[in-house]
């Protein structure tokens, strides 16, 4: 296991209800990536955009080569196939980890899920399937963060096996989106710099998001 390598999987909602926040989302994502580049740690990034389809735009790219996200990639449309996006991400990363030599496997895997609404269009994975997948990967030390707007994020996270202290309900406005990416960026930076390969996300990771009220 390579304790110096972090795999970051970012699952980002681009369904129609995200309309009006495209520029804020793009700006926040790009700032987060720039933050990781500045830190200089070994981070591979997988970015998955989802609506009623799942689109992988970065497939384990070293963070230093990632180009800024633009409106060509991030544009809103469609419904919310959240379970399909999460299931696809886990199976893909799980396959990679299993087939790499032991010394090339990431010591830390962080899956960040952001959505502004409830699941409503998945066709390939059920809630129970995803819950079991997440529970199994948590046993291997993977961390999952769930950020949700317009929903009870803690309740929805628990349905798929993510603890409440790894979830947060955010305000779906410009400032709320900005705080989301800042919080995730800090959490990832601390995790990438940590020597430990378990429990590398701090429990206060979402405090700034929680204190913001529109």
Question: Can you annotate each of these PLM segments?
Answer:
Residues 1-214:
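Acidic, low-complexity intrinsically disordered regions
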